[in-house]
Amino acid sequence: MADNFNFELVSPERLLLSEMVTEVVIPATEGEMTVMAHHAPTMTTIKPGVVSVRSASGKKQDYVVFGGFADILPTGCTLLAESAVPVEELHKDELTRRIEAARKELEDTELHEHKSKLEHFIMELTHLRGVVQQD
């Protein structure tokens, strides 16, 4: 049986989850990471994606996050999301609205570095929209 650890998912609006879990899969910017008890201390940035949580009771919960940071310690993990919502509460048009807003910002920007970041962000959101709509 896997050991449990404390996981917290926090957005500026609210604390979405704080409970003992067996594993959490997070969309780190360098690739998906599975976090379990006794994980090596790590700090990572989060890209838009789905956070999958397996609670100590075995229940699986998914959340959509739109970037942030994760602080991982052997005894727990805290994910500070720029924005987050349970998958079942995500409105279908929310991702489309965010993609369109990023495209509008892309049209209005002059800086090459900012354009590159926006193009990458649009790609991540488009991929996320495909993943969420398949579930």
Curated annotation (Swiss-Prot):
Pfam families: ATP-synt_DE_N
Compartments (UniProt record): Cell inner membrane
GO MF annotations in UniProt: ATP binding; proton-transporting ATP synthase activity, rotational mechanism
InterPro entries: ATP_synth_F1_dsu/esu (IPR001469), ATP_synth_F1_dsu/esu_N (IPR020546), ATPsynth_dsu/esu_N (IPR036771)
Keyword annotations of the record: ATP synthesis, Cell inner membrane, Cell membrane, CF(1), Hydrogen ion transport, Ion transport, Membrane, Transport
Main location: membrane
Superkingdom of the source species: Bacteria
Membrane protein topology class: Peripheral membrane protein
GO cellular component: plasma membrane; proton-transporting ATP synthase complex
Function: Produces ATP from ADP in the presence of a proton gradient across the membrane.
Protein family: Belongs to the ATPase epsilon chain family.
Assembly mode: F-type ATPases have 2 components, CF(1) - the catalytic core - and CF(0) - the membrane proton channel. CF(1) has five subunits: alpha(3), beta(3), gamma(1), delta(1), epsilon(1). CF(0) has three main subunits: a, b and c.
Protein name: ATP synthase epsilon chain
Organism: Rhizobium leguminosarum bv. trifolii (strain WSM2304)
Gene expressing this chain: atpC
